[in-house]
A protein has these predicted regions:
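A short hydrophobic beta-strand segment most commonly corresponding to one strand
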Residues: 135-148
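Short, surface-exposed beta-strand-loop junctions and turns on beta-sheet-rich folds
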Residues: 90-92, 136-137
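Bacterial N-terminal signal peptides that target proteins for export
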Residues: 1-8
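Short, conserved beta-strand element in jelly-roll/cupin
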Residues: 69-90, 96-105
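His/acidic/aromatic-lined binding-pocket segments of jelly-roll/cupin-type domains
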Residues: 66, 73-76, 111-112, 119-120
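A short, N-terminal "cap"/entry segment at the start of jelly-roll beta-barrel domains
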Residues: 4, 15-70
Length: 148
């Protein structure tokens, strides 16, 4: 009987070790309306996970051309407008951090006139660029999905 109890205790203990080694389950992120509205006034991150980031972003000037090797960008335009270029070939690209290049121009890209209510998804590896942003700016909800 003592042997059976010892074996049972060993099994229970080993289950604890196995479960302790399992990665934690993903957590649900909830951000209430007050915090979201606060972020529209002062943009910043909403949520981060192992394979995504979500944030509110605001631009008041043109940016640099970007190419992310492992990130898909998803934008929903909340306010304002911008001229946005996708595809084509990046000019003057330099790696600024692992899996990201920044450049100065795009040749042969497609131009989009983004405005309030528009949605655009830019797959990993596609050059993209806020080419023109009026002084009144553009505010957008951004999700970056990271592929392994």
């Amino acid at each position: 009987m003592r042997c059976a109890i010892a074996i049972a205790a060993a099994i229970v203990a080993s289950l604890g070790v196995v479960s302790a080694q399992q990665p934690a389950a993903p957590q649900v992120t909830y951000v209430d309306a007050a915090k979201v509205n606060e972020l529209f006034a002062k943009p910043g991150p909403l949520a981060n996970g192992a394979d995504f980031t979500a944030s509110i972003a605001r631009r008041t000037a043109a940016g640099q051309v970007e190419v992310h090797a492992k990130e898909t960008d998803i934008f929903y335009i909340v306010d304002g407008s911008a001229t946005f270029v996708t595809g084509g070939t990046m000019v003057g690209g330099k790696e600024t951090r692992p899996n990201q290049m920044l450049g100065t121009d795009i040749t042969g890209g497609q131009t989009h006139q983004l405005k309030k209510g528009d949605f655009i998804s830019i797959p990993a590896g596609i050059p993209h660029w806020f080419k023109e942003v009026p002084a009144s700016g553009v505010t957008y909800y951004m999700v970056k999905v990271v592929k392994p």
